[in-house]
């Protein structure tokens, strides 16, 4: 006898011939011979049963008629060294039986099989099973598979077996794999129709209402399983008062704009979530110190330097929907660099900067509306400046800090509306060259230079401004001081990356609001020799947004699933 497997094979031969068997497992009219010692060694259930008062030592039978005979037989064969023959049809029965009998190795083998074979064809079935038997490992994996394949599953025959509680969980999840929030109501309606269950307010609350198109909101209003419920109509009548929703993880693309370390090109990179890497999707001739603004998923780059010693008045753009460059855009009124860029729903604004002729600071704010033939002067700042932070919030253009006359930083904060300029609470410290983002109704700034007099080294400061209370709050500092970093908001989180810190940095950081701390983010590491200049979350757009509302709009929406 050379090893344990040979010994087990011999004992199995004894079992098959009935030698030394001291227990019979009875399931209805079927009997399975076995040895107590073998069963006790593999099964916690049998170990307790045979070593306690549950069964008399002289009893020769154990009745397990409440279990599936074939599963028990397969598991006893497994105890005697015969491998489990698992299929999608039998694995659930074997797993639940192994769980009852507490055969740990068989449970692990079944779980591995299910996890390996999970797909869109069986994930709902396994999710319902795991929920019933409280198997958290399989439940989590199958739920994530449902999220990834949700738009395939809305026509699956098992879709109707999901409970309302499960649908609330699915529709609430940030990782729901839809590239436009309009698909979430489609998922809800398909489930309501398959179950013929009336809608509830709890289900409607799972939708990111503020992100829905008017056509889809009308479709919800008019659907019989929604419109027949008074509470649902009341909820929809009050959606104007709901807080702004954050887009789901898959409904935006992260697009970064940067320049190569070798100073030979502008690079447009897209974040690949599956690989956790940034991938270059396009590039063009080098330019730096330009302003960036995004309107209708088109990234505009204004002014700056190219490889000549002169500042540029040219404006170029990158269309993220068509992955193409746009060059036929009217030039700025005059060449400038180190300016700020923002956009509202109609216009792109180019703010301040440095003039080409005499390197003097600029106070003018020019704007351009796509399809118009030229830029117009919109307003002038109270003080000429460059390298300031700019943000658009609640219809106001905020100008934050910057470099003013004498090459010094300023702590001024002002906003521009149709009624003119308004002063606000000054920055806690004079700053310039910081990154700026609007997030959750506040303005956040990070990095740059900060100094009470002349401009000097990089900063790791992070501040937030609350426009309601007109106050600044100092947050936890960055791990790495950065000049002109990219600051972006995605999935209700803040990120900072790139910029210059003594040398160019490829690192990024994530902000934990609850702990008030920044952590280095290994998931958004930038390519080598790449200076991230700006990062913009781009919301996916679909041709359906141009389609007029009809009674069968949701059916029309369904046709865009694979687009």
From Swiss-Prot:
It comes from the Viruses. It is found in: Host cytoplasm. Kelch repeats lie at residues 252-297, 298-346, 347-395, 397-441, 442-492, 494-538. Residues 21-88 form the BTB domain. Keywords: Host cytoplasm, Host-virus interaction, Kelch repeat, Modulation of host E3 ubiquitin ligases by virus, Modulation of host ubiquitin pathway by virus, Repeat, Ubl conjugation pathway. Residues 123-219 form the BACK domain. One of its GO terms (biological process) is symbiont-mediated perturbation of host ubiquitin-like protein modification. Its main location: host cell. SUPFAM superfamilies: Kelch motif, POZ domain. It holds the Pfam family BTB. Interacts (via BTB domain) with host CUL3. The BTB domain is responsible for the interaction with CUL3 while the Kelch repeat domains supposely serve to recruit the cellular substrates. This is Kelch repeat and BTB domain-containing protein 1. It comes from Cowpox virus (strain Brighton Red) (CPV).
């Amino acid at each position: 006898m050379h090893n344990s497997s040979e010994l087990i094979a011999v004992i199995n031969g004894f079992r098959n011939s009935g030698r030394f068997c001291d227990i019979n497992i009875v399931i209805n009219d079927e009997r399975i011979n076995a040895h107590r010692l073998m069963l006790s060694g593999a099964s916690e259930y049998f170990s307790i049963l045979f070593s306690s008062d549950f069964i008399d030592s002289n009893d020769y039978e154990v009745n397990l008629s409440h279990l599936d005979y074939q599963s028990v037989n397969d598991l006893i064969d497994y105890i005697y060294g015969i491998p489990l023959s698992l299929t999608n049809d039998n694995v659930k029965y074997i797993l639940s039986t192994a769980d009852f009998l507490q055969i740990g190795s068989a449970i692990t083998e079944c779980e591995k099989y299910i996890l390996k074979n999970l797909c869109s064809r069986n994930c709902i079935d396994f999710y319902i099973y795991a929920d019933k038997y409280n198997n958290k490992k399989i439940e989590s994996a199958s739920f994530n598979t449902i999220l990834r394949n949700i738009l395939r599953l809305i026509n699956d025959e098992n879709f109707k077996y999901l409970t309302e509680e499960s649908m609330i969980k699915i529709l609430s999840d940030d990782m729901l794999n839809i590239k436009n929030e309009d698909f979430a109501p489609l998922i809800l309606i398909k489930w309501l129709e398959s179950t013929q269950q009336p809608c509830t307010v709890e289900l409607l609350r799972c939708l990111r209402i503020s992100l829905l198109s008017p056509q889809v909101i009308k479709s919800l209003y008019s659907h019989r399983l929604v419109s027949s419920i008074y509470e649902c109509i009341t909820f929809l009548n009050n959606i104007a008062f709901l807080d702004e929703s954050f887009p789901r993880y898959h409904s935006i693309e992260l697009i970064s704009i940067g320049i190569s370390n070798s100073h030979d090109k502008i690079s447009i990179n897209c974040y690949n979530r599956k690989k956790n890497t940034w991938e270059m999707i396009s590039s063009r001739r080098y330019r730096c110190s330009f302003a960036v603004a995004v309107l209708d998923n088109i990234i505009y780059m204004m002014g700056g330097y190219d490889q000549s010693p002169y500042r540029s008045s040219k404006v170029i753009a990158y269309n993220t929907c068509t992955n193409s460059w746009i060059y036929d855009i009217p030039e700025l009124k005059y060449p400038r660099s180190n300016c700020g860029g923002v956009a509202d729903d109609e216009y792109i604004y180019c703010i301040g900067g440095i003039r080409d002729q005499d390197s003097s600071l600029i106070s003018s704010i020019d704007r351009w509306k796509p399809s118009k033939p030229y830029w117009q002067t919109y307003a002038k700042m109270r003080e000429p400046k460059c390298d300031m932070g700019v943000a658009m919030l609640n219809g106001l253009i905020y100008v934050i800090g910057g470099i003013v006359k004498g090459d010094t930083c300023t702590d001024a904060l002002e906003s521009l509306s149709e009624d003119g300029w308004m002063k606000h609470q000054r920055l806690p410290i004079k700053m310039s060259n910081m990154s700026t983002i609007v997030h959750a109704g506040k303005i956040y700034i990070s990095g740059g230079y900060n100094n009470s007099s002349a401009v000097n080294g990089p900063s790791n400061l992070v501040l937030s401004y609350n426009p309601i209370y007109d106050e600044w709050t100092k947050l936890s500092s960055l791990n790495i001081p950065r000049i002109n970093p990219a600051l972006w908001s995605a999935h209700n989180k803040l990120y900072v990356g790139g910029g210059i810190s003594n040398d160019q940095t490829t690192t990024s950081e994530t902000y934990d609001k609850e702990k008030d701390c920044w952590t280095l983010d290994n998931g958004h590491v930038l390519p080598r020799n790449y200076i991230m200049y700006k990062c913009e979350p781009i919301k996916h757009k679909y041709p359906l947004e141009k389609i007029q509302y009809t009674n069968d709009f949701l059916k029309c929406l369904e046709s865009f699933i694979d687009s």
